[in-house]
């Protein structure tokens, strides 16, 4: 009986060591992958040479991965607060990283097609709220994952259009935001407020507003890239 308890205790300890998440992220060198393995252009021609996309591997730490990072070259552990905004969950963080990657791909396609004098259709859906800034008035009405689709009943066509609309306002102006949350449309009110000590810059009070959009290019571009996020590889995609 005593040996059984010891065995169970050891098993629980091992499982905790291997699987309990810690408030750290482990970063290490990732893979170098040829762009042509996941990006294709309909009717495109293959050139000589090869373009490689280099990635950084990142995972949530467990006690095991944390200890391993201390002895593995080119591997480091950082507190999750370095990557996650206040109030942002791990799922929200993953979603933000995916949107950053989507934006990188879309910007690359748009720029490449402009250089080739080809048109790209953009279906702009809104602005993704990465997280409201703690202490801001927006923190009372917005949550990570919300998508802002209109200001004072007027939609916007690009991220820059959204930013210009906000910056044209004065601190203290009340604005009505149309948002999508969990598949439902809502209307909330907040105030434009200063976002720096000088008071020269104003905003709604959210971190890193990201565009939520889809693009359609002709000839069609297919990017079959999974499990890669972040604002990376834009130059490689464009080339």
What annotation goes with each model-predicted range?
Residues 30-45, 49-61, 80-133, 189, ...:
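PDZ/PDZ-like peptide-tail recognition elements
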Residues 163-207:
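PDZ-domain C-terminal substructure recognizer with occasional recognition of PDZ-binding tails
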Residues 4-22:
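Hydrophobic membrane-insertion alpha-helices, especially the h-region
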Residues 96-99, 221-231:
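A short glycine/serine-rich beta->alpha loop
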Residues 68, 106-110, 139, 159, ...:
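Extracytoplasmic/secreted envelope proteins and their assembly/folding machinery
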Residues 133-138, 225-239:
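Gly/Ser-rich catalytic serine loop of serine hydrolases
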Residues 138-160:
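Conserved PDZ fold ligand-binding element
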Residues 18-35:
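Aromatic-capped interface at the extracytoplasmic side
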């Amino acid at each position: 009986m005593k040996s059984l308890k010891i065995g169970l205790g050891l098993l629980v300890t091992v499982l905790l060591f291997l699987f309990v998440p810690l408030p750290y992220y482990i970063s290490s060198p990732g893979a170098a992958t040829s762009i042509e393995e996941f990006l294709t252009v309909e009717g495109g021609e293959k050139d000589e040479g090869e373009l490689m996309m280099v990635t950084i591997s990142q995972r949530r730490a467990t006690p095991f991965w944390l200890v391993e990072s201390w002895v593995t070259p080119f591997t480091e552990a950082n507190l999750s607060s370095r990557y996650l905004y206040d109030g942002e969950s791990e799922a929200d963080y993953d979603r933000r990283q995916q949107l950053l990657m989507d934006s990188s791909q879309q910007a690359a396609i748009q720029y490449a097609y402009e250089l080739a004098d080809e048109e790209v259709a953009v279906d702009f859906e809104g602005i993704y709220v990465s997280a409201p800034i703690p202490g801001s008035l927006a923190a009372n009405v917005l949550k990570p994952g919300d998508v802002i689709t209109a200001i004072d009943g007027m939609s916007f066509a690009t991220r820059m259009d959204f930013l210009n609309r906000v910056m044209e306002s004065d601190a203290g102006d009340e604005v009505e935001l149309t948002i999508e949350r969990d598949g439902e449309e809502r209307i909330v009110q907040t105030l434009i407020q200063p976002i720096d000590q000088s008071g020269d810059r104003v905003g709604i009070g959210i971190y890193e507003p990201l565009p939520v959009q889809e693009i359609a290019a002709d000839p069609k571009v297919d990017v079959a890239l999974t499990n890669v996020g972040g604002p990376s590889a834009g130059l490689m995609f464009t080339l």
